[in-house]
Amino acid sequence: MSDYKSTLNLPETGFPMRGDLAKREPGMLARWTDDDLYGIIRAAKKGKKTFILHDGPPYANGSIHIGHSVNKILKDIIVKSKGLSGYDSPYVPGWDCHGLPIELKVEQEYGKPGEKFTAAEFRAKCREYAATQVDGQRKDFIRLGVLGDWSHPYLTMDFKTEANIIRALGKIIGNGHLHKGAKPVHWCVDCRSALAEAEVEYYDKTSPSIDVAFQAVDQDALKAKFAVSNVNGPISLVIWTTTPWTLPANRAISIAPDFDYALVQIDGQAVILAKDLVESVMQRIGVTDYTILGTVKGAELELLRFTHPFMGFDVPAILGDHVTLDAGTGAVHTAPGHGPDDYVIGQKYGLETANPVGPDGTYLPGTYPTLDGVNVFKANDIVVALLQEKGALLHVEKMQHSYPCCWRHKTPIIFRATPQWFVSMDQKGLRAQSLKEIKGVQWIPDWGQARIESMVANRPDWCISRQRTWGVPMSLFVHKDTEELHPRTLELMEEVAKRVEVDGIQAWWDLDAKELLGDEADQYVKVPDTLDVWFDSGSTHSSVVDVRPEFAGHAADMYLEGSDQHRGWFMSSLMISTAMKGKAPYRQVLTHGFTVDGQGRKMSKSIGNTVSPQDVMNKLGADILRLWVASTDYTGEMAVSDEILKRAADSYRRIRNTARFLLANLNGFDPAKDMVKPEEMVVLDRWAVGCAKAAQEDILKAYEAYDFHEVVQRLMRFCSVEMGSFYLDIIKDRQYTAKADSVARRSCQTALYHIAEALVRWMAPILSFTADEVWGYLPGEREKYVFTGEWYEGLFGLADSEAMNDAFWDELLKVRGEVNKVIEQARADKKVGGSLEAAVTLFAEPELAAKLTALGDELRFVLLTSGATVADYNDAPADAQQSEVLKGLKVALSKAEGEKCPRCWHYTQDVGKVAEHAEICGRCVSNVAGDGEKRKFA
C-alpha cells in the first residue's frame, strides 16, 4: 500500500495547543518591557484623536485584591479597544498616597509622631512606606497585562502633584467656595480626626433607646394652648433618642409644624406626643390607662420652653421639617453640636452649637460632675441613671440599629462640632451647578445619574480639613484675633506651592511665616490642618490631567471605578472641578459592581471565600482572569469562584483552538503572492469572511458601548457555531486533499487569513497575551505588535443580490443541522460509523430543492457525507425523517456505496480505477497527479 500522507496538506504550526499561560506570560511581559511596548504604541498613535481614561488612584496600602483586578482590567480593555479604534489613548496609572491608613501602619511600626521622632521624620517614613506599597501593587498590575506608563505614574505624594493640590484649593478659595465653621462632622475618636462621607461604613450596634420627659416651664401657657384646665400633675414634652450621651448638648426640642400633637393624661402627669404615635408610645412605656385631653398643631407650641432634665437650663420647642412619624414620639431631641439636621435648624433659631466632647471621645471638664472625662459610649448608662434619679425617664430598652462606623477601625463614630474648613455647597451655587453638570455626563449604567444626583442634592457642605500629620497642608494663614484669612491668601498659597514643588509638603511645616509675611507674621498663624485625602484624589483632573504632556490639555473622557465611588471619587472630583472650573471633569462615568463568591456572598477572609488574583495568575494565567472579567456583566455583582474561573478556562480553550486551527492551516501561505481575489474565491469561503465581517460589526459596536460580555459572547458564537461546527469542519477536506497551490485550497487559506487577521484584533483588548502570541505566528509582513494597529479592514461578504447569499447559507446551516441529527441517530443504531460512511437523500419542496441542487456534487462536502442527492418532497419514503426546523424537508440515510479512499476517507465507486494509483479515488488522483479538482461553491 502506497503512503499518500505526504501528498496531503496537513496542518502545521509552532503555535502551541496548550496556552500554559502561567509560565508563558511572564516572558511576554519581559519582552513588552524590554521593547518599551507602551512607548511604541504612543509613537504609533501620535497625532490621532485622543481618548483619555483617567485612572482613579487606588490607595497605596496592601496587596491588590480581586476588585482591583476587575477595575484595572476593565480600564485596560477600554484603552486597548480605543487604540484599535484609531484613538491615541494614553494611560497614566496613579496612586493615592496620603492619609490615615498609611499613618496607622507607620505608627504601628515606629510609634506616633512626637513620641520617638519628629513629625518631619514621621512624614518621611510615611512617604517611604507609600513608595514600597506602590512598587508592590505596580508589579501585580503589570502582571495582569495592563499597559500604561508604569515608569512614570502619578502619585498624590509627588512634589509637583502636592503643589498642584494646593493650587486647586487656592482656585476654590478664589471662587468663594471656602468657609470656616464649627459644624458637626463625622468624627472617629480612634483616628482623632474628621472623616469624609466615603470613610463611613454602617454596622449593627446595640444602643439604649429612651423616652425622656422635658417638663414645661410655663404649665399654664400649655394648658391654654390645649384649652384644658383639669390636668393631673406636671406637663412634659417627651423626646425619644438612641444616643443618651448627646443629652448634655441638648439645646432644643424639634417638632413638626403640621403634625397634630396630643396632651395625654397618664398616672400623675401629662405628656405631649404626636397624636399618631400615642398608641405605640403608650404600649412602649407600659401604660394602658390614658386619656387624650386635647390636640393642637405643632406650630402652636413653637418657642414654648421646657426644662432640661439635669443640665439646669431650659430649652425651646422649635419647628423642623426633619421630624417624622416613623418612630419615637414626634418630638426630636436637638443637639446642634452632634448632628447635621440639628445644626441646620440650630442656625435658623440661633441656638448654641455646644460641643462638650473632646477629640478622644471623652466629655470635656465642666460638662457635668459625673460625666467629665468619661468616654461618651460608656456614658449612656450614667445618663440613663441620671434621668431615672431626676424622674424624667419614662422608658428604656436595648435596641439594635444601623450605626455609622469608621471604615478603618470598624468602631462607632460620633458627630462632633469642631472648627473645620468647608467647601460650601450653596454660598456660591456649587450644588446647583454640579446638578446641572451631572446631566451633561453619560453615566454607565444609566442609574448612576439618579444616584449621584440624589447624593449631591442632599449632601452637606464638604468638610475638607483634617487634623493629620501625613497629608497636603491647607497652606493658609489666619489672623490671630479675627481668624480671617490673610488678604493675600491666593498669592501666599502660590508661594507655598512653589516651595512644595521643590521640597514636598514638608516645606510648609519648615516655613517660617516671616519669610512670606514679613512684619505681619506676628499677627497671623499657620493653619495646621491637612486636606481630606478625597481632596487629593478629587483634584487630579487639575493636578495631573491638566499638566501631563501626554494629555495635551484635553479633559478626561472617562472615569471608571466601583459603584461605591459615586459618593467617593466621582463626587469629590465633580465638586472640585465644578468649584474650580464650573464644569464636570469627565464626559463618561462607568461603574462596575463588587466581586462576590459563586453563591453571591461578599468576599471575606473570615468566611474564606476570597479569590486571590495572584493565585489565579500563577495557576491559570492573567488571560483567564481577563476573560472572566470581560465575560461578566459588570453592571451588577461580579461572581467569581474556582468553578466560574474553570468555565472561563474552557471558553479560552475554544478561542485558542480556533486560532490554532487558523494558524495551522495557513502553513505555506504567503499573503503577498497566494491571496485569491474575492471574485475568484469559492462561495463558501466568501461567506465565511462575510461571517467575520458581521461578527466584527457586532463586536466593534459592543466595544464602543463597553458591553464586553457581549464581545465575548459574540466571539464565542463565531468560534463555536459559525466556524467550529460548520465552516472549519467543511473545509478540512478541501484544505487537506486539494493540490497545495490550487485555487480551491488558496481560496480557503485566503478566507482563513482574513478571519485570523480580524480575530486576533478582536481578542487583543481582552486576551492580550494570547493575541500577542497569535500575532507572532501570522503569515505576512506586519508591525511587531497587534496593539499598534487598528481593526482589520480587509473583510468583505456576499452581496444580497447573489443567488448564494447569506440567507442561502443560513438555510444550508439548518439543512446541515437536520442531516447531522439523522446521522447521529444512525450512529447510535450502529448503521454507520462516521458521517463519511453515509449517503443522504434530501426530499425537499421545490424552492429548497432548487437551492440544494444548485450546489451540484459539492452538496456532499457541505453535509460531510460521501453522497448527497436531492429528490421531490412528495417522493419521500415512510422512514424518511421529517425536519422539525424546515417544513419542506425530509432526510433519508443509507450506507454509502463503494470503497473508502485511504487518502480522503470518502466512499466512492471509482477507488482503484486508475492503474497508477490503484488505491485512491478519482478525485484524489486528480489532486495528486492531475490538474486538481475544481471547487466553485464549497
From Swiss-Prot:
ATP binds at residue 605. GO terms for cellular component: cytosol. A motif ('HIGH' region) lies at residues 58-68. Binds 1 zinc ion per subunit. It catalyses: tRNA(Ile) + L-isoleucine + ATP = L-isoleucyl-tRNA(Ile) + AMP + diphosphate. GO terms for biological process: isoleucyl-tRNA aminoacylation. Keywords: Acetylation, Aminoacyl-tRNA synthetase, ATP-binding, Cytoplasm, Ligase, Metal-binding, Nucleotide-binding, Protein biosynthesis, Zinc. Its EC number is 6.1.1.5. One of its GO terms (molecular function) is isoleucine-tRNA ligase activity. It is an enzyme of class 6 (ligase). InterPro entries: aa-tRNA-synth_I_CS (IPR001412), aa-tRNA-synth_Ia (IPR002300), Anticodon_Ile_BEm (IPR033708), Ile-tRNA-ligase (IPR002301), Ile-tRNA-ligase_type1 (IPR023585), Ile-tRNA_ligase (IPR050081), M/V/L/I-tRNA-synth_anticd-bd (IPR013155), Rossmann-like_a/b/a_fold (IPR014729). It is found in: Cytoplasm. Zn(2+) binds at residues 901, 904, 921, 924. Its cofactor is Zn(2+). IleRS has two distinct active sites: one for aminoacylation and one for editing. The misactivated valine is translocated from the active site to the editing site, which sterically excludes the correctly activated isoleucine. The single editing site contains two valyl binding pockets, one specific for each substrate (Val-AMP or Val-tRNA(Ile)). Monomer. This is Isoleucine--tRNA ligase. It comes from Escherichia coli O17:K52:H18 (strain UMN026 / ExPEC).
